[in-house]
Amino acid sequence: MRYKSPRERAGLPGERPAEAAAAPIDHALIEAWALRHLERYASSAENLRRVLERRVKRRLGSDDEAVRAARDLIEELVARYRASGLLDDAAYAAGRARRGVARGRSLRRIAAGLAAKGVGAVDAAAAVAALGDGGNAELAAACAFARRRHLGPYRRDPLAAADRRRELAAFALAGFDRHIAEAVLACADEAAVAALLSGAD
């Protein structure tokens, strides 16, 4: 007796094999994937290319000829989206850099994140430079990091010597310079943080 799936036992048609159910990869399907991704996420051109190539490889497996044909379609689509302005690496990098500072990421970590997303070195450097004076942006990011992690003036409990070393280590792991970390940790309260930030302008 052949095993029946729950769908077949319920009287519903059986499940089709994945190969039969999969639509052929053509320009319309790749564009649908790209638009669905861009509706949900901001993306650089290289990141969108990687996302689409992963989907193609997942769908086609080891069919090298079909994968190459799909890559050509992806390249054409990315070039068209860049020309139309739908993909703008400079704007993507600038927005991601601003959000990074607001979330407490160091400028080094922001630059590394942009490189990981496929943003070119020129666009990444311009985005970091657009944040203004590097020291002020780094200090603002360090203050946001301290607030998110409850360090320095945002800590809940009195500080022991071992805790101070641990807090300095947290700043170092996040990519902040020691003098910036010490300046933030030296603040007694949020008013001191505001004074520190206004003094850096």
Describe these PLM feature segments.
Residues 1-201:
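An alpha-helical, amphipathic repeat domain used for nucleic-acid recognition
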